[in-house]
């Protein structure tokens, strides 16, 4: 009689082998999200560096070109494709470039390349935070918070131009290009008077205020530990005990404002809620602009201002400023439209 001792070998599938490799504990965690994040982030960043350093883009936009043509870090950009190309993906092997790399660069193919790979890289980074949080049994609030800048990127660089006539109306990837796009938004959409923009500003500036107050309050209420009780000398970075006094901080702000956060959970949730909600709201506003929705047009004031030259409000001044921005930008931005503005809508010296 023969007795077999031991367990039969279990056959592992290819999926289990890949899962074991990507989630293995190493210096830089890869994970399933890394299969999306690392290649797309590498290609997006590499495309941007290539575009701003070597590739000329006068063909498509006239806003900026490469360092080789005299631009600096502020003015160089990966420019958007021409308006005539609409929403084409501008694939290198597509009908526009037909496999010609130089032609692809000239047409603005790098912009769609950077925009799409950049969007997937940001999504991959958010999924990475989900994956690591799940593996170490944390809540996923980091990933949820990171969805806010992703929503802004996607709404500005993808959804807005999709709602317009082409990628041409998205921002180019550069510093001066982004500021120019902001002026464009104001001139053509009166963006600063949009309530979603107001909520976004409140979220970003409110978050900065909360961050400054929180940091200062923690520094103010550090427990003394030794003779040199300051931020940098008196504390062991691996100490297990509490570093600052929430009770003292609560008492301080109760005396200042009459109210204060009662516990750390509510305090830190509020610091999460303010900027994330603000960015989400601003992204919603940009989606509205993609559809050319108007917000807060005070038509009665415009009619009265047209009838009475003496009538002037902040709003009517704003309208004149927007007209000036449009007149200044349109000829360069949209030469194919052959726009001609009548005398009465052009900026009028000191009238502004």
Swiss-Prot record:
Location(s), subcellular: Plastid, Chloroplast thylakoid membrane
Membrane topology recorded in Swiss-Prot or TrEMBL: Multi-pass membrane protein
Native source organism of the sequence: Pleurastrum terricola (Filamentous green alga)
UniProt similarity note: Belongs to the reaction center PufL/M/PsbA/D family.
Protein name per its UniProtKB record: Photosystem II D2 protein
Source taxonomy: Eukaryota, Viridiplantae, Chlorophyta, core chlorophytes, Chlorophyceae
Chain sites annotated for binding Fe cation: 214, 268
EC numbers on record: 1.10.3.9
Phosphothreonine PTM sites in chain numbering: 2
Reactions catalysed: 2 a plastoquinone + 4 hnu + 2 H2O = 2 a plastoquinol + O2
Primary enzyme class: oxidoreductase
Binding of pheophytin a, residues: 129, 142
Molecular-function annotations in GO: chlorophyll binding; electron transporter, transferring electrons within the cyclic electron transport pathway of photosynthesis activity; iron ion binding; oxygen evolving activity
CC terms in the record's Gene Ontology section: chloroplast thylakoid membrane; photosystem II
Cofactor note: The D1/D2 heterodimer binds P680, chlorophylls that are the primary electron donor of PSII, and subsequent electron acceptors. It shares a non-heme iron and each subunit binds pheophytin, quinone, additional chlorophylls, carotenoids and lipids. There is also a Cl(-1) ion associated with D1 and D2, which is required for oxygen evolution. The PSII complex binds additional chlorophylls, carotenoids and specific lipids.
Keywords per UniProt: Acetylation, Chlorophyll, Chloroplast, Chromophore, Electron transport, Iron, Magnesium, Membrane, Metal-binding, Oxidoreductase, Phosphoprotein, Photosynthesis, Photosystem II, Plastid, Thylakoid, Transmembrane, Transmembrane helix, Transport
GO biological process, one term: photosynthetic electron transport in photosystem II
Function, in words: Photosystem II (PSII) is a light-driven water:plastoquinone oxidoreductase that uses light energy to abstract electrons from H(2)O, generating O(2) and a proton gradient subsequently used for ATP formation. It consists of a core antenna complex that captures photons, and an electron transfer chain that converts photonic excitation into a charge separation. The D1/D2 (PsbA/PsbD) reaction center heterodimer binds P680, the primary electron donor of PSII as well as several subsequent electron acceptors. D2 is needed for assembly of a stable PSII complex.
């Amino acid at each position: 009689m023969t007795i077999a001792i031991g367990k039969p070998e279990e056959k592992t599938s290819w999926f289990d082998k890949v899962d074991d490799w990507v989630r293995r504990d190493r210096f830089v965690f890869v994970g399933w999200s890394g299969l999306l994040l690392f290649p797309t982030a590498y290609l997006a960043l590499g495309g941007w560096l290539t575009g701003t350093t070597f590739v000329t883009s006068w063909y498509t936009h006239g806003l900026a070109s490469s360092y080789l043509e005299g631009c600096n870090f502020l003015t160089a950009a990966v420019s958007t494709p021409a308006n005539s190309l609409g929403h084409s993906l501008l694939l290198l092997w597509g009908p526009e470039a037909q496999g010609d790399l130089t032609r692809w660069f000239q047409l603005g193919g790098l912009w769609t390349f950077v925009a799409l790979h950049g969007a997937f890289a940001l999504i991959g980074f958010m999924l990475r935070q989900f994956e690591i949080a799940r593996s170490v049994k944390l809540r996923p609030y980091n990933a949820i918070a990171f969805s806010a800048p992703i929503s802004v990127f996607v709404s500005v660089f993808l959804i807005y131009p999709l709602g317009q006539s082409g990628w041409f109306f998205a921002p180019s990837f550069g510093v001066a290009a982004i500021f120019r796009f902001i002026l464009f938004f104001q001139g053509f959409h009166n963006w600063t008077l949009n309530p979603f923009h107001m909520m976004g500003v409140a979220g970003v500036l409110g978050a900065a205020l909360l961050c400054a107050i929180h940091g200062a309050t923690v520094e103010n209420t550090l427990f003394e530990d030794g003779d040199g009780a300051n931020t940098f000398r008196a504390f062991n970075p691996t100490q297990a005990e509490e570093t600052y006094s929430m009770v003292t901080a609560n008492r301080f702000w109760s005396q200042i404002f009459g109210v204060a956060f009662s516990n750390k959970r509510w305090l830190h949730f509020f610091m999460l809620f303010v900027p994330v909600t603000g960015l989400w709201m601003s992204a919603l506003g940009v989606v509205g602009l993609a559809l050319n929705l108007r917000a807060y047009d005070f038509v009665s004031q415009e009619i009265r201002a047209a009838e009475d030259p003496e009538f002037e409000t902040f709003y009517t001044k704003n309208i004149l400023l927007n007209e000036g921005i449009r007149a200044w930008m349109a000829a360069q931005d949209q030469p194919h439209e052959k726009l001609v503005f009548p005398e009465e809508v052009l900026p009028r010296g000191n009238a502004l």
